[in-house]
Design a protein with these regions (language model features):
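Acidic/histidine-enriched, glycine/proline-rich intrinsically disordered or flexible terminal extensions
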Residues: 205-220
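Phosphate-coordinating loops and pocket residues in cytosolic domains that bind phosphorylated ligands
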Residues: 46, 194, 203
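Short, flexible loop/turn segments with low-complexity composition
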Residues: 87, 200-208
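Short, solvent-exposed turn/loop segments enriched in Gly/Ser/Thr/Pro and often Arg
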Residues: 33, 159, 205
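GST-like fold's C-terminal all-alpha helical module
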Residues: 102-194
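GST-like domain detector, emphasizing the conserved glutathione-binding G-site
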Residues: 1-129, 219
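Residue-level recognition of oxygen-bearing side chains
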Residues: 68, 184, 197
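Active-site-flanking alpha-helical
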Residues: 74, 167-168, 202
Length: 220
């Protein structure tokens, strides 16, 4: 099986790459430079007409939407333990609900904070402030849950931990959001980043940026 991940360092494709690393499989990567607008280039639109990352090509077939990609990887590589299992069909869907929440609800708030200009052609300060307020509410909920639990689902890591980490850490990058208000999230972040699979993700991303001659962000 030939797998290629189309990604950009620090984007939500970082979560997808972490899942691939946890699965311990061989895969190729192709960086799509979001800063230069490569995602909207004719060449990339031939790969993914949605013009976004991540995109995962498996034996010539393309899969998009992070929550769907992660769900498929969990099916293909169950031994990796990307998501918790349950014999109860309703409980078994909870991780998929959480991933959809990350993608459809939380990610747009991240975008409000980091890229408010995408929401309007006018003044952006109100949009960013609204995103910061919303993320504060969400982070309070994250912190309450993680204060009494090592990982999102208890004592065992899942890819949802990386997705939640990506949400709050990306919001805070560049001091745009006051993450220090939530010490439980700082502790959770340290646990996520300490995992060998995540360290391999960081190395791959650094290598991709260096190969492209791009700087490594301070909050990487």
């Amino acid at each position: 099986m030939k797998i290629t991940l189309f990604h950009f360092p620090t984007a939500c494709s970082r979560v997808t790459m972490n899942a691939l690393e946890e699965a311990g499989i061989d895969y190729e990567t192709q960086m799509v430079n979001l800063h230069s607008g490569e995602q909207k280039s004719p060449e990339y639109l031939e790969v993914n007409p949605k013009g976004k990352v991540p995109a995962l090509r498996i034996d010539g077939q393309l899969l998009t939407e992070n929550s769907v990609i992660l769900g498929l990887l969990d099916q293909l590589y169950p031994a990796a333990g990307l998501l918790p299992r349950s014999e109860d069909p309703v409980r078994a869907m909870q991780p998929h609900i959480d991933m959809a929440w990350c993608a459809a609800t939380l990610h747009p708030i991240v975008r409000q904070i980091r890229n408010p200009q995408r929401w309007t052609k006018g003044e952006t300060s109100g949009i960013q402030a609204d995103g910061i307020e919303k993320m504060g509410v969400e982070c309070a909920g994250f912190a309450a849950r993680l204060s009494g639990s090592r990982w999102w689902y208890g004592e065992r890591w899942s890819i949802v931990d990386t997705y939640i980490y990506w949400v709050y850490s990306t919001s805070a990058r560049g001091d745009l959001f006051p993450l220090e208000r939530f010490p439980a999230l700082g502790e959770h972040a340290a646990r996520v980043r300490k995992r060998p699979s995540f360290q391999r993700v960081l190395k791959r991303e650094r290598d991709a940026l260096e190969t492209a001659g791009m700087p490594i962000p301070e909050s990487f």
